[in-house]
Amino acid sequence: MKITLPDFTRAGVLVVGDVMLDRYWYGPTNRISPEAPVPVVKVDSVEERPGGAANVAMNIASLGAKSRLVGLTGVDDAARALSAALSGVNVQCDFVSVATHPTITKLRVLSRNQQLIRLDFEEGFDGVDPEPMLERIQRSLPGIGALVLSDYAKGALATVETMIALARKAGVPVLVDPKGTDFSRYHGATLLTPNLSEFEAVVGKCKSEADIVERGTALMQQHALSALLVTRSEHGMTLLQPGKAPFHMPTQAQEVFDVTGAGDTVIGVLATALAAGNTLEESCFLANAAAGVVVGKLGTSTVSPMELENAIHARPESGFGVMSEAQLIVEVKKARQRGEKVVMTNGVFDILHAGHVSYLANARKLGDRLIVAVNSDASTRRLKGETRPVNPLLNRMMVLGALEAVDWVIGFEEDTPQRAIAEILPDLLVKGGDYKPEDIAGSKEVWANGGDVQVLNFEDGISTSNIIKTIISGSGKN
């Protein structure tokens, strides 16, 4: 499917559901406890992230959309940490505080990128007065493009039938990430997004795609659903709609590090794209691409427009071309296993010219694989002025990816690619011009990893700025 990203800033999405705080304790394990046969983790860092429905809201905000969140919390430090983290990423919180219950908290202990144990601090919110939640939903419905109901069976969606009815009456599509086996609670929803295990718990074991289609179609009819999206892990996703052919999407994940919160990303991106004006099929395609990015990260994570742009134009099946940073890290790992030397460079590459081509060819000769990191449009404007870039990011990346010398192309939002370089850690970092190696962004990280940094010369007299001046002069403009 050919698709371009919509203007997510036009979208407004309301998320209602079970909010929670995800806590992560990280540290090395070098010995077994003398008290019991368990590893001892020496905790050296702690992290807190919004989880559950709050992670859905963060995924929406990370795309630049207007994200509003309604949920239940306690009156405690976890609630304050949750509110602070969400407000910091432009999620508008409208929580109902319940003094008699603690905020749901999940504590995960990790060592060497492996989760050792999870501890849950919760009582659930069953029996809490639903009226404050319903009032907040009613107040928020005008002006939003989609309602997401994120159900973790903790009590926030005790009156989910009423919530769906309110939204449908207001003409707002309702997307539900379900929980449990009683899907009758979601009667009349626009879309349900169960994973395969949740789906089979309701309809029985499916031995083939034909079973999924047949039983999914019956489920839609039974509960008056407008659509059903079954997420199927390594088998991708299947979208079912009454009267339409099934829409199967293969997975875009290159390597899975952590599936925590992947379902939150799917429904968050899907709802945002739908609210921004995409069709349901297009929205599912974008959600599938986003899931492929986020499972390559550790812990509950979000996806940025840049990562999504890279992912939907990637060629993961070939292992080369334009791709996301997460996909690139996987490919670089494979290249090193093959004994290949990885070279990396960066730039704006606005109007590609002979000087660029010569420089990139020379950089490629210094190793076996060449990565080109490209400034985003916003980054280019900050560096070059409001009239630049002439060519948008996707066009620049696609042209670079077509060059014989270039193996991989990624985009980055920052003014420099230092963060990306620190993540990728090439064997050789190359920069064109009259830089000193120690002044090149990312040089310290590459040296610390045992790599090298080298400066190459550009061809004299050839530059994008000069080309633009020549074009303007030739057109008779001053």
Curated annotation (Swiss-Prot):
InterPro entries: Bifunc_HldE, Carboh/pur_kinase_PfkB_CS, Cyt_trans-like, PfkB_dom, RfaE_dom_I, RfaE_dom_II, Ribokinase-like, Rossmann-like_a/b/a_fold. Pathway: Nucleotide-sugar biosynthesis; ADP-L-glycero-beta-D-manno-heptose biosynthesis; ADP-L-glycero-beta-D-manno-heptose from D-glycero-beta-D-manno-heptose 7-phosphate: step 1/4; Nucleotide-sugar biosynthesis; ADP-L-glycero-beta-D-manno-heptose biosynthesis; ADP-L-glycero-beta-D-manno-heptose from D-glycero-beta-D-manno-heptose 7-phosphate: step 3/4. Its EC number is 2.7.1.167, 2.7.7.70. Signal peptide: none annotated. Keywords: ATP-binding, Carbohydrate metabolism, Kinase, Multifunctional enzyme, Nucleotide-binding, Nucleotidyltransferase, Transferase. One of its GO terms (biological process) is ADP-L-glycero-beta-D-manno-heptose biosynthetic process. One of its GO terms (molecular function) is phosphotransferase activity, alcohol group as acceptor. Residues 1-318 are annotated as: Ribokinase. The active site is at D264. Residues 344-478 are annotated as: Cytidylyltransferase. GO terms for cellular component: cytosol. This is Bifunctional protein HldE. It comes from Erwinia tasmaniensis (strain DSM 17950 / CFBP 7177 / CIP 109463 / NCPPB 4357 / Et1/99).
